[in-house]
Structure formats: structure tokens, C-alpha cells
């Protein structure tokens, strides 16, 4: 509050940060200023975190200077920091308003496991599918829930890569007349795609449709959606849309032939 009163609202966040560093130092309060740390899983860097402060290894304040209100993305950002630093308490502070606005947050860790799922018939390489699911399952079992989508994408990449399969990050493809369009899925062994979502309720139709778009333009037969929610984790196998339609047409034809022969 003293920093807000001394500086006034609405300036660059860095000014408030520097003033807080000076105030904490003068008061003899132990703190880390913008500590940058890597999240490493099985020797592979999955993400990098840099909170504004870690104070007395007890709580994490994050400084903002906003025109509007705190958003869910701000909360997710702080929860990621708390999970990584293994701290429960954090504080969002907004220097953008006439009065100092702050919100105290408490992080609670959750663990999860995937329900055992057999690859469906359209999966052309069941062994690779099983390897992917097992690797990612071990990762979520070890790490627990709470990270954002970008962090989980890095963790999934690290988990799969650590057990052998080749992983291509952000593959590109030609879409209609547009060259080099980047897809957010991971491509595994040039065989399938993996799409990662997080902090939503569950895998939904949009998630499946997005992966199908990636499969279509990357010319891959199948893929897996992994979702890491607030309290649960789940997965779904997805087929290339044209392959799926072809299979459905074949089943209808076969069904029609059976009906004719029975008459």
C-alpha cells in the first residue's frame, strides 16, 4: 500500500516491482525477485517459470497494472507458480486502480490417474498408442494436476520423448493455399498427433474437432486428446475425419449387403 501511495496508479508494472524490491530489502524481508526456474521432467525442460516474487519461501505475490478486472488466466498463472514452488498461498496485486486491489489465493494440489482405455480399432499402431498413454499416465501420476495448458504440453512432450518415440513440436502443414501453417498438436513418430488441453471441465466436441483438423492437414490417421483438469484427467482417441466417414460408409454398405442376402 505504501508503494501504491508513493507512486500512484496506472504506471508500468516494473516501477512498482522495483519499489517493492527496495521496500522489502530495507525492511530486511527475505525475498527472491523474478526467480527464473525450469520445470524439468526426466531430464527434459517442460516449461520455465518466473514469478514476480517469492517472499520468505512462504507466499508468491504477482503484480499487475490492469484497466479491467483479474481474469481466470491470472489465477491459473499464480496456481502454476504455487504448484512449482510447492507453496500454498499467493497474492494478486493490481496497481492500476485508484485504490490498491488485491486478492489472496490458496492453492490445493490434486492427483489423478487415467481410466484404463484400450485403443480402438482405427488405431493403426496399438503398441505406439499404449506407449504414449503409459508415458503420459506415469507423468500425471508423478506430477499431479494444477498446471496450465502450455506447461502440460511441455510435460507430455517430455514424457513421450523420454521413453523413446520421436516427438515433433508445433508441426506445420499446407492448408488450402496457405503454406507453413503451424498446428498446436504434437506429432509422434510421424504416425499420430497428440493434442493437450487443461483446466477445463472435460474433453469436449471442440477439442475433438480441433484434433481432427490437425489430423486432416497433417495427413495422419489418428490421434489422442489428453485433458488435465482441476481435479480429473482423461483422454480420448480421435480418428481422421475422412477415414472415419469412409469406415462408416463401408459399414453401411456391408450392412445393406447383409440385408439383401437375407431376403
Tell where the protein language model's regions lie, with residue ranges:
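Short, structured coil/loop segments at alpha-helix boundaries
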Residues: 41, 70, 122-126, 208
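Residue-level marker for well-ordered alpha-helical positions
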Residues: 18, 75-76, 134, 154, ...
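A short, charged helix-loop
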Residues: 112-120
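Long, low-complexity, intrinsically disordered segments
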Residues: 258-263
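A short mid-domain helix/strand-loop element embedded in enzyme catalytic domains
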Residues: 125-133
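Nucleic-acid nuclease catalytic cores
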Residues: 60, 64-111, 197-248, 252, ...
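Active-site metal-binding core of divalent-cation-utilizing nuclease and nuclease-like domains
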Residues: 3-58, 98-109, 125, 137, ...
Amino acid at each position: 500500500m505504501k508503494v501504491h501511495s508513493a507512486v500512484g496508479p496506472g504506471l508500468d508494472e516494473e516501477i512498482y516491482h522495483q519499489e517493492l524490491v527496495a521496500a522489502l530489502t530495507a525492511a530486511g524481508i527475505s525475498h527472491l525477485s523474478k526467480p527464473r526456474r525450469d520445470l524439468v521432467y526426466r531430464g527434459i525442460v517442460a516449461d520455465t517459470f518466473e514469478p514476480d516474487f517469492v517472499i520468505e519461501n512462504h507466499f508468491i505475490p504477482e503484480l499487475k497494472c490492469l484497466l479491467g478486472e483479474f481474469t481466470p488466466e491470472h489465477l491459473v498463472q499464480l496456481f502454476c507458480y504455487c504448484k512449482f514452488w510447492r507453496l500454498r498461498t499467493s497474492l494478486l496485486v493490481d496497481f492500476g486502480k485508484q485504490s490498491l486491489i488485491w486478492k489472496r489465493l490458496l492453492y490445493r494440489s490434486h492427483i489423478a490417474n487415467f481410466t484404463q482405455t484400450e485403443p480402438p480399432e482405427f488405431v493403426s499402431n496399438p503398441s505406439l498408442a499404449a506407449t504414449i498413454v503409459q508415458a503420459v499416465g506415469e507423468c500425471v501420476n508423478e506430477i499431479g494436476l494444477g498446471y496450465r495448458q502450455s506447461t502440460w504440453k511441455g510435460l507430455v512432450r517430455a514424457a513421450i520423448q523420454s521413453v523413446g518415440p520421436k516427438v515433433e513440436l508445433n508441426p506445420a502443414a499446407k492448408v488450402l493455399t496457405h503454406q507453413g501453417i503451424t498446428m498446436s498438436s504434437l506429432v509422434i513418430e510421424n504416425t499420430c498427433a497428440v493434442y493437450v488441453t487443461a483446466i477445463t471441465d472435460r474433453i469436449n466436441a471442440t477439442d475433438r474437432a480441433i484434433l481432427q483438423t490437425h489430423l486432416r492437414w497433417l495427413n495422419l490417421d489418428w490421434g489422442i486428446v489428453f485433458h488435465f483438469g482441476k481435479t480429473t484427467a482423461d483422454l480420448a482417441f480421435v480418428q481422421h475425419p475422412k477415414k472415419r466417414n469412409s469406415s462408416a460408409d463401408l459399414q453401411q454398405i456391408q450392412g445393406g449387403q447383409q440385408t439383401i442376402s437375407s431376403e
